[in-house]
Amino acid sequence: MKEFIAHIRESREVQSHQDHSRNVAKLCGEACKSIGVEHVGYLAGLLHDMGKAHEKVQNHLWNQTSEKLNHATAGMRWIWNENKQKKPSYKLMAQIVSMAIGCHHSGLDNFISPKGEEDWEKRLASETAQQLYEGSVKAFLEQCMSVEEATELMHKAVTEVITLVKGINTEEATLAFFALSMVQRFLFGALVDADWTDTKCYMNGEKLPEPVCDQQRQEVWNRLSESVEQYIAAFPQKYAIDAERTRISNLCLQVAEQNDRGIYRLYVPTGGGKTLAGLRFCMRMAQKQNAQHVFYFSPYKSITTQNS
């Protein structure tokens, strides 16, 4: 059996299906490590293009035909078929991975429609899904992943899902399901980003980005925090409002230095320097914790528009 491809450059150089699948698995797993589901992410990345392991899809890739072929459903269907008769933890893992795979080109769907119908299961059983399924699975398990590896990965992924569910500290079903939906969204986003990143790097002849280590991230926060401090220190102190803004900003910095992570509120009148005071707090907290991200949310409309 000839080696299947995932992408082809204008120069007719090709990226193998196996290389793309492994690269996406690595990137997706690395991203999902931060929420404790590294193997869930790796499994989703590895299976996401299972449907490309079919002669019809390969012909489309080589010849750039206009035929529309569904290559996303094969991996979605396989992971579900392998686990739907097992324990609830296996079924939950399979649902999460299945939905991320099936939607990685179309956008995340609902498990259940407003009418209470499970449209995703209808998709698994659709005629278009069936056409490519058997051939794709057989070829994929020969070229990209063995059954033994798949079994081991699924077991590790289930262990992560069990730990995740136990860590959702609430007895309220609505909140628990919301938490799981956030995991679903995270996995979906990680998979799409990993897929696009590997595709872009290959097509542009670039190396895949290396994961940022703790030391590198700490150096970034140190630089950013110092930049914010220098920027704020350069403000003139001409008027009483300048002194008050500085006082508020210093209090925010003090809170960041004396406290650990948590939820904090800042109540300051309009014009009191909330934006920069909050940024200063945020940078120092991120520096202390060597955080992975800082998210900044701003109003859709300006403050003056909201108050008018």
Region roles according to the model:
Residues 53, 108-109, 272-276, 303-305:
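Flexible loop/turn segments at secondary-structure boundaries
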Residues 17-20, 27, 39, 45, ...:
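Conserved pre-motif I regulatory segment
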Residues 259-285:
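Walker A/P-loop
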Residues 14-18, 40, 176-180, 238, ...:
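Conserved phosphate/pyrophosphate-binding and hydrolysis machinery centered on Walker-type P-loop NTPases
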Residues 44-45, 98-103, 265-271, 295-297:
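Extended hydrophobic secondary-structure segments that form protein cores and membrane-embedded regions
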Residues 1-13, 17-230:
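Accessory nucleic-acid engagement/destabilization modules that flank
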Residues 277, 291-308:
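Conserved Walker A/P-loop ATP-binding site and its immediately adjacent core
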Residues 247-250, 254, 282, 286-298:
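Glycine-rich phosphate-binding loop of nucleotide-binding enzymes
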